[in-house]
């Protein structure tokens, strides 16, 4: 496993200790997904992930490696090329890389995606994923849109950028959703009080010729192709 540190991010692990990462999958991908977000990780987001990944993939905001691990179980030969993990948290990178279990083909990049990521153009990817990342970033959705501009140079002309984010605006929330988002925003685990779906879609359309999006429950799912050069 190759490790690159492209930002001084080691101090950003307040909420990403080993115990929380162990608990994360059960709470986020089962309890919260089904009863709060109303968008199943297993039945909706995982098939979405599977349908968009390429042989040379970059996963941004890796969490515990839930989606990557699930892909490996279904497609043991994937990825055919290098797998690149990008995150702002060292523990998440280590957890995800160990869980995927292909150290010889995995590189970890510690970086802040709100800033340009200095990965060389010849290392462009067939696919880039942003699953449940944007709602954790600081700022309003209009500001977070620059993430797409920062990632676009890393994508091949034939590649796909795709992802999902939890919305606090422009969606109907049940009481459980409302309570969780209120708590998570209060402790800065989420920062999506000023996130609007239209802002994300507009930002994608500025950077890509083809953009698709859909809201399921309180989750915005999006994918973009044909990066504007």
UniProtKB/Swiss-Prot annotation:
This is Methyltransferase ctvB. Methyltransferase; part of the gene cluster that mediates the biosynthesis of citreoviridin, an inhibitor of the of F1-ATPase beta-subunit. The HR-PKS ctvA accepts acetyl-CoA as the starter unit and catalyzes eight iterations of malonyl-CoA extension and four iterations of SAM-dependent methylation at C4, C12, C14, and C16. The KR and DH domains selectively act on the first six iterations to generate the hexaene chain. Its EC number is 2.1.1.-. Gene3D superfamilies: Vaccinia Virus protein VP39. The keyword Methyltransferase applies. Belongs to the methyltransferase superfamily. The lineage of its organism: Eukaryota, Fungi, Dikarya, Ascomycota, Pezizomycotina. It comes from Aspergillus terreus (strain NIH 2624 / FGSC A1156). Citreoviridin inhibits mitochondrial oxidative phosphorylation by binding to the beta-subunit of F1-ATPase. Ectopic mitochondrial ATP synthase is a factor that mediates HIV-1 transfer between antigen-presenting cells (APCs) and CD4+ target cells, and citreoviridin can completely block antigen-presenting cell (APC)-mediated transfer of HIV-1 at the APC-target cells. Inhibition of Ectopic mitochondrial ATP synthase by citreoviridin can also lead to suppression of cancer growth by activating the unfolded protein response. It is an enzyme of class 2 (transferase). GO terms for biological process: methylation. Pfam families: Methyltransf_12 (PF08242).
């Amino acid at each position: 496993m190759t490790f690159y540190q492209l930002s001084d991010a080691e101090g950003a692990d307040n909420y990403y200790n080993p115990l929380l990462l162990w608990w994360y999958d059960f709470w986020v991908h089962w309890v919260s997904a089904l009863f709060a977000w109303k968008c199943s990780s297993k039945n909706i987001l995982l098939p979405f992930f599977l349908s968009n990944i390429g042989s040379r993939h970059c996963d941004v905001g890796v969490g515990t490696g839930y989606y990557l691990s699930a892909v490996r179980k279904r497609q043991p030969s994937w990825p055919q090329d290098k797998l690149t993990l990008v995150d702002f948290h060292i523990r998440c990178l280590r957890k995800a890389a160990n869980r995927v279990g292909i150290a010889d083909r995995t590189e970890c990049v510690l970086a802040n995606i709100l800033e340009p990521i200095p990965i060389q153009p010849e290392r462009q990817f067939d696919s880039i994923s942003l699953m449940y990342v944007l709602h954790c970033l600081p700022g309003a959705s209009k500001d977070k849109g620059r993430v797409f501009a920062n990632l676009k140079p890393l994508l091949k002309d034939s590649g796909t950028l795709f992802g999902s984010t939890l919305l606090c605006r422009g969606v109907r929330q049940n009481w459980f959703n409302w309570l969780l988002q209120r708590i998570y925003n209060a402790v800065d685990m989420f920062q999506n009080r000023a996130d609007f779906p239209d802002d994300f879609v507009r930002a994608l359309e500025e950077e890509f010729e083809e953009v698709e999006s859909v809201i399921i429950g309180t989750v915005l799912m999006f994918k973009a192709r044909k990066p504007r050069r």
